[in-house]
């Protein structure tokens, strides 16, 4: 890229006078950005206990592993969702992760494994609900729609190696006709998302849930290009309502 530097000697004195003010403004701006960007540790602490690894076993496939190569079932992520309390835990994940599974395990931060079963599934929105007997702390749901440009973070089982934490912004809301699901209402984000992230949590800076990670746009294989999509919280609630209509009880 070509850069052209313009030098005007008549402005030298004015520039010298304005420089301290300019520097002060920059310092104020940078300190403000640091305050916003520094929410990461608090966001992580608020949500980490409510996000689990999901490891399905598919017929004819080995157990999930790094990168889910051919012949290995894809690893995924799950969100402990606040449904009926006191009877185990309900875990939200992407339907495409568990739809073919003959066995499902969820793994917590300590590495403990728990047998899970599909309690309800909605292929049209790519939402599934698992149930485990173990009680985990549910995630807190956000109120209202996320604002475009607001800071968000993703807690996901990237490449099947464990829960990781990435942050970005809300790039857009209300995305539909993207081509992943029959019924779509996505929150778009540039927070890094990779294979294994499906079913992961997209949260606000306060750790409250705004969506479930579902898909990415990319030109090459499964490489993150910063155009990533999460099923919106209203769409998740629609999916749960549809399951209830079909007789699923929570």
What are these regions (language model features)?
Residues 59-60, 82-164, 246-249:
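Conserved active-site neighborhood of the chymotrypsin/trypsin-like protease fold
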Residues 3-22:
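Bacterial N-terminal signal peptides that target proteins for export
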Residues 20-31:
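Bacterial N-terminal signal peptides
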Residues 79, 192-213:
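Catalytic nucleophile loop of clan PA
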Residues 39, 71, 97, 139-185, ...:
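Flexible, gly/ser-rich surface segments that form the specificity/activation loops bordering the active-site cleft
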Residues 37-42, 59-91, 112-115, 137, ...:
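A conserved glycine-rich beta-strand in the N-terminal activation segment of trypsin-fold
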Residues 36-46, 154, 205, 209-250:
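C-terminal cap/linker of serine protease catalytic domains
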């Amino acid at each position: 890229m070509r850069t052209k530097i313009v030098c005007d000697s008549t402005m030298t004195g004015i520039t010298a006078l304005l420089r301290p003010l300019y520097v002060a403004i920059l310092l104020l701006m940078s300190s403000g950005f640091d305050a916003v960007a520094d929410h990461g540790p608090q966001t992580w602490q608020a949500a980490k206990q409510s996000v689990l690894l999901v490891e399905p076993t598919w017929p004819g496939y080995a157990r999930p592993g790094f990168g889910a190569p051919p012949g290995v079932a894809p690893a995924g992520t799950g969100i402990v969702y606040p449904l009926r309390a006191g009877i185990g835990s309900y875990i939200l994940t992407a339907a495409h992760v568990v739809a073919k599974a003959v066995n499902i395990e969820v793994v917590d931060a300590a590495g403990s494994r728990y047998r899970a079963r599909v309690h309800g599934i909605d292929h049209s929105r790519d939402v599934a609900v698992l149930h485990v007997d173990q009680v985990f702390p549910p995630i807190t749901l956000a109120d209202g729609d996320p604002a475009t440009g607001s800071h968000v973070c993703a807690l996901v089982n990237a490449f099947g190696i464990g829960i990781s934490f990435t942050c970005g912004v809300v790039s857009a809301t209300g995305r539909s006709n993207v081509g992943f699901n029959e019924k779509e209402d996505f929150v778009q984000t540039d927070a890094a998302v990779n294979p294994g992230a499906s079913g992961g949590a997209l949260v606000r800076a306060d750790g409250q849930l705004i969506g479930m990670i579902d898909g990415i746009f990319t030109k090459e294989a499964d490489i993150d290009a910063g155009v990533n999509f999460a099923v919106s919280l209203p769409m998740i609630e629609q999916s749960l309502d549809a399951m209830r209509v079909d007789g699923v009880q929570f």
